[in-house]
Amino acid sequence: MNHSNLANPTVSLTVTLIPKHPIRHLTSPIPNRNFTNPKLLFPLRLNETPSSSLAAKRVFIVRATVDGDGKTGNWVNRLPIPGLGAENVFRLISSATGSPIGQFISSPVTFLHSVDPRIKLVWLLTLVVLPARANLVVRLGLVLCTALLSILVLPRQVWIDQLARVSLLSGILFITLGLGSDGAPPMLQSRTPPSSITSLPNLPMSLSGYSYMLLKLGPLQFTRKGLSVGSTAACLTFIIFQSASICLATTTPEQLALALRWFLFPLTYIGVPVSEIILTLLLSLRFINLVFDEVRSVSLGIVSRRVNWQQLTVLETLDIFASFIRRIFKNIFRHAEQISQAMIVRGFRGESSSHKIYFFSGSSNKFADFASVLCLIGVISTALLSEYFLV
């Protein structure tokens, strides 16, 4: 029997699905600018195929670096911070070391150039002690006098650069110590019984308007203790740095060494090696100029090469900074070796007492010395009298 002619049995079943809730469109409404006519993005109905409803497709490509000619992009140089650029760092170093910091300025010649260096050292000691012991008015007066003296004595570009940096450092110290010394209020519990128990009226906090807290910034508070600590540190920093800079700018290293030797000479009777100390100080003051010159010349050499920092990686940039520091130390050690060889050629054998050191110092002006001593006495008298009248 041939079974190929027989038909296969089939069963047909009709199923009708009635949903309990109405079918909604799976849409994502996105309003326009006026928020009045919302539009539907990619409407998806049950009677449509996914290929027709999801025709638009957005492709996202994630890249870690910038592509270009098969090279790895330097993501550090593309940070939105312009101060992180290596070239900007080298330019700042070259400009900072370009101004004479702690160096003698021979011109223009001012009245401070003719003052005796021993009087200048006494002035330095006075300007260190007075701000720490005087009140706020005297401190601010000394700061203003030091700033005015810098403007009168130093060249314009020099005093602008120095005053800006010292003022920035002093301002940071004032804000930090002013808010940090007594900024967090202590959690104290009063031991005085309330007025309801003692049957005494509440007394005012102050009869003369005195207030310990001067300013309140959220959780921080600026008190009188913070004002005292911050002003003392800021004024001391400004006066010490700027007065030392003025002294070094108007006095040669030989004059400073001779003045310090005059003050330390009585210590030779108790065995203090004054000659070695003075020689070390003289060499240190002479060596400051060499250090600044080397830092400036090496940084300018790197800037003048016009290195394309955008194509360098982080390790390559760090390698350039390491070579920069290594080159500076190499040049400094070479200069130190040359100085030692020059001293040996001139007969120095390591004993300062047996080797004669000639201090070439110009003659001071008697009128300038007398005026400086009078000003010194006036400043000390004003600081002492302020403790009795300015309370």
UniProtKB/Swiss-Prot annotation:
Assign the protein's first listed, main location to one coarse class: plastid
Q: Which GO terms describe its cellular component?
A: chloroplast; plasma membrane
| Residue ranges of the TM segments | 134-154, 168-188, 229-249, 263-283, 370-390
**What topology in the membrane does the UniProt record assign?**
Multi-pass membrane protein
The answer to whether keyword Plastid applies is yes
A Pfam family matched by this chain, by name?
CbiQ
Q: Where is the transit peptide?
A: 1-63
Query: Where in the cell does this protein reside?
Result: Plastid, Chloroplast; Membrane
Alphabetical UniProt keywords: Chloroplast, Membrane, Plastid, Transit peptide, Transmembrane, Transmembrane helix
Q: Which CDD domains match?
A: EcfT
Q: Which PANTHER family does the record associate with it?
A: PROTEIN ABCI12, CHLOROPLASTIC
Q: What is this protein called?
A: Protein ABCI12, chloroplastic
UniProt gene name: ABCI12
